Each structure stands twice: as C-alpha cells, then as structure tokens.
C-alpha cells in the first residue's frame, strides 16, 4: 500500500473539463529554460515534459513526429550540431546535444548532455599486460586475464607461434619460481617451448607438456623485476594457428603468487573528468541545463560491478556534475525478463533520492526487441502495454522527463525500430502525456490519500494539485499482471462526489472519503477531483 500523509482538504463535484489538446503544436523558440520548484523543466515560463528520442539522425525526424516526441537527444546523424538543431527547429522540435560552442544560442536548444553513461563499468588491472609485435588482440579476452587469478578463464594469443606478452607491475617483486597454466582445446595450437625474460635478462626456458593446468618451474636463483616478458618459441600444432593461455604465475619465498593482479571495475569516465566537463559547459553557457544518463549500477539490486560502498561514493560525485539526471534499464530488450519491469520504477525512486528534490530525473524506456545481448530466436517482444507501463512507472515515481530507446541491432541495425502497433500506441501515449503535463508536473497535493489493491497486489500512485483540482495518477504494479480492485481513501472527499476518469469517458461516484476502481495488470488510471 502506498500512502501520502499530509494535511486534509475538502472536495466537491468534479465538473472541470480535461486539459485541452496541445500535442500537435510545433514548439516555440526557447527564450529561457529553468528548473521549477517541482523539479520540472520550464520553458519560457511554462512547465514542459520532454518526450525524448535517443541518438537519431535528422532523417528520423518524421519518425519522432509520428510518435509525438518533442525532443531529440544526442546527434545521431552526419550534420554538425548547429545544422542538426536547425533541422529540429524547422520541424518544431527541441534538441539536446553534446556541448558544442558552435551550437550555442540556437532557438530550439533545450540543453547539453554529457557523454553517454559515464558510469559504465570497465575492468582495469594494477598490472599492465602489453602485446608483442604481430599479436592480434581479441577484445573479448583481454590480456589482463593472464594474471587475474582465474584459472578457468583464458586469453587468445593469435598467432600462438612467437606470441609475446609483457607483464608490467606497479612495483618490483622477487620470485623463486614461475608457473604457466595452459588451455587445451580441440583444433587449437598449444604452447610448447617458452621463455621468460625479466628486465631484459633471460630467467627461464621451459618445455611445456600438452596438458591443461599449471606447470611449475623453479628458477636457478631468485629474480627481482617489475617487467616480465613471456614468449612462445614453439607449439604443438593445431588446425588453427591461434591458441590460448590461462594464467602466468610467479611465486615468492612465502609461496604467494606475486604476479596476481585481479581486475576491478571502474567507471569509464572518472567523476573528476565529468566534473571538469560540467564546469567547462556551465562557464561557456549557464543558460542551459546539463543532462547525464547513467546505467542502472547505482541501484541497490545491482552490486555485481560496484559494491554498496563504491555506489555511495561514486554516484553523489557524478550527481554534482549535472543539472538533470537520468538512467536506462531495458528489462525485456536487454535481459529478456518482463518480470523485471518493476525495476524501472525502483530505479527512478533510487535516482530521485540521489538527485534530491530539486533536480529533474528522466528514464529511458524500451520500445522494441533486437538487442545484441539476447539471441534473436529467444528475444521476447516489447509490447505497447509493456512500454506504456514502464513510462507510467517512471512518471509516478518522480520522473519529469521520458526518453525512448528505439535502436535495434538484430536482425539488422536500425536507429528507429518501432513499427505499426507500437508507433500508434506511442503516439496516443505521448499526446496524452503532453496534455497532462501541467498536472503531472504540478506541486504535490496537500491531501492525505491512501491506495490499496485487493489481494495485497502491489500498487503506487502520485497526487498533484493543479488549477483547483486534485489529480491522482495510479497504477497496478503486479508483475504477474493480475487484475485487482483498488480502494482509495481521500480525506475530505464527500459521499456522492463524482470522480472524473481522465481520457476514459467515464466517472466514478465516491462513498464517504472513499472510491474504488478496477485495475487490470500494469494498468494506470488518472483521476481528477475538483477542490
């Protein structure tokens, strides 16, 4: 059950009309962009709900108009930012692009955006492992795996004959013995005669057995070094010229592997780098907000890259370098897990807590399948109902802008992949959101409200006060998509009062401070009661 606990007010018959349709109007030139007291965008003094498309070319402008989007974020075309923004302006659309001094002052420039996902995790190692001449690198098997301590992983050496890698350590070590962990796979060459050189001096020549596992070799005398080079001088031939290696190890007098350098996760852009870019942008153009999009790795449920302590340190630092914070998670497109749709809502709640009450928050929402992370024959469809549910989850939890991710990679690449039914559904949804934006972005209602679904199904709601009316935006959050009856308790609501169901052509009759309604799985309803 979700609750607001705030002062009470009285309500009477709801006789007000629905907000007038304004969806089709081209957007006017921007004189001023502000952040309002409800963490909303305000353009020329009026509340504005950005409905964004990500990284589209100018050729996709008709697609954006077809779904009722109002903002293109990221320049996905070949035009320079200045020309790109002009193309958007000519079609009544706003643009958000990477900072570009040449693009400043454009009539439809809504804001600037940092490089995408600065928090995206990458693995680094304290040891630098460098390839020798002629070695072809395989990005899926990075060289640092050779000293990561994981014996079941491997690194491709292509070609294996004469392959050479150099391990550079942060500080000198002294070893008494060395180890080589081979991988043996059908059809692949296997290392046979190998050599080790430390600081340019040979310390070991060895012949390896054609078998898996560690092969250990004592040195004639201890060797001290910070740079160790391993070379394959001959191979057990295979059908392929390439082979692989699992680990190199070096043991000190105590028997510890002092070559061991487990990788760790770090953001691809350090907070200090993002902060410097933010200061540069704000110094050059203080008139426009700076946006950022994060991955979902700030969420409590995701600690596979950053543990809780790292999350708590990293993300507040990032947050200080933006005016608007967003994130992306694609439960079906990225994970094939429709049961994860709730994470869109949870992510917005957690991001809102990080952003604070005054910073706008946005969420990127999936619209289609075709990801490179799920096999094409296994990919589930992203349905219009899924996308609509995710959008409302984000808005109810506090997002004040919505973005749509429309790219696909399979079976072929497209910037804008939604078709047919999804395009029509997005147009209906975005037109509705454009109409409702003043109410959605209004101040929280000064009323005590409770919502409970039958059978204790999960639910949530948002309530605002706009132009003398109480607005309630409510949703069934049950991931099993069960239907439930919602009971709303609204302090001050008079028995017999009519509650308008916005955009549904029907109304409800209140009991004494209460009304009920049916909610299909993941469905939302919008209610209006006159104050």
Predicted feature locations:
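Aromatic- and acid-rich polysaccharide-binding/catalytic face
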Residues: 110, 116, 308-342, 400
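Carbohydrate-binding surface patches
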Residues: 453-493, 522
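Glycan-recognition and catalytic regions of carbohydrate-active enzymes
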Residues: 410, 420-469
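Catalytic domains of carbohydrate-active enzymes, especially glycoside hydrolases
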Residues: 53-87, 91-102, 320-325
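Active-site clefts of carbohydrate-active enzymes
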Residues: 351-384
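C-terminal beta-strand-rich structural cap/linker in extracellular carbohydrate-active enzymes
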Residues: 510-531
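Aromatic, loop-rich ligand-recognition surfaces of beta-strand-rich domains
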Residues: 145-204, 210-265
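Aromatic/acidic polysaccharide-binding cleft in carbohydrate-active enzymes
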Residues: 364, 378-431
């Amino acid at each position: 059950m979700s609750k607001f606990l705030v002062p009470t007010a009285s309500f009477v018959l709801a006789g007000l009309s629905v907000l007038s349709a304004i969806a089709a109007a081209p957007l006017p030139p921007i004189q001023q962009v502000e952040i309002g007291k409800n963490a909303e965008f305000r353009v020329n003094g009026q509340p504005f709900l950005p409905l964004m498309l990500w990284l589209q070319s100018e050729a996709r402008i008709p697609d954006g108009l077809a779904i009722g989007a109002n903002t293109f974020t990221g320049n996905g075309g070949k035009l320079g930012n200045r020309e790109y923004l002009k193309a958007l302006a000519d079609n009544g659309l706003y643009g958000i692009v990477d900072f570009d001094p040449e693009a400043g002052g454009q009539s439809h420039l809504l804001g600037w955006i940092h490089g995408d996902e600065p928090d995206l995790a990458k693995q680094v190692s304290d040891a630098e492992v460098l390839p020798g001449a002629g070695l072809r690198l395989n990005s899926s098997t990075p060289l640092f795996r050779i000293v990561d301590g994981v014996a079941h992983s491997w690194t491709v050496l292509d070609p294996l004959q004469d392959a050479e890698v150099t391990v550079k350590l942060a500080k000198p070590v002294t070893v008494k013995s060395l180890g080589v962990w081979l991988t043996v796979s059908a059809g692949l060459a296997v290392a046979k005669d190998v050599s080790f050189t430390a600081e340019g001096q040979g310390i070991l020549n060895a012949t390896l057995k054609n078998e898996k596992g560690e092969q250990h070799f004592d040195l004639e005398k201890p060797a001290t070094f910070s740079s160790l080079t391993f070379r394959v001088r001959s191979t057990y031939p295979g059908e392929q010229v390439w082979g692989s290696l699992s680990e190199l190890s070096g043991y000190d007098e105590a028997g510890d592997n002092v070559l061991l350098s487990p990788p760790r996760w770090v953001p691809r852009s350090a907070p200090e780098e993002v902060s410097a870019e933010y200061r540069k942008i704000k110094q050059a153009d203080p008139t426009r907000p700076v946006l950022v999009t994060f991955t979902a790795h700030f969420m409590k449920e995701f600690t596979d890259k950053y543990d809780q302590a790292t999350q708590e340190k990293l993300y507040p630092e990032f947050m200080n370098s933006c005016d608007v914070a967003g994130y992306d998670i694609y439960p079906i497109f990225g994970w094939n897990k429709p049961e994860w749709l709730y994470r869109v809502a949870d992510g917005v709640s957690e991001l809102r807590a990080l952003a604070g009450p005054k910073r706008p928050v946005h969420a990127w929402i999936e619209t289609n399948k075709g990801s490179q992370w799920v096999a094409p024959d296994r990919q589930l469809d992203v349905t219009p109902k899924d996308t609509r549910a995710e959008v409302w989850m984000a808005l109810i939890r506090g997002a004040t802008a919505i973005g749509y991710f429309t790219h696909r990679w399979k079976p072929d690449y497209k910037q804008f992949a939604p078709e047919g039914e999804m395009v029509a559904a997005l147009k209906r949804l975005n037109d509705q959101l454009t109409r409702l934006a003043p109410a959605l972005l209004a101040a929280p209602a000064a009323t005590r409200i409770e919502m409970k679904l039958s059978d204790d199904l999960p639910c949530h709601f948002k309530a605002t006060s706009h132009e003398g009316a109480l607005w309630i935006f409510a949703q069934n959050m049950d991931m099993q998509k069960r239907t439930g009856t919602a009971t709303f308790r609204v302090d001050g609501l008079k028995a017999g009062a009519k509650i308008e169901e916005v955009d549904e052509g029907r109304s409800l009759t209140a009991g004494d401070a209460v009304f009920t309604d049916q909610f299909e799985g993941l469905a939302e309803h919008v209610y209006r009661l006159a104050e």
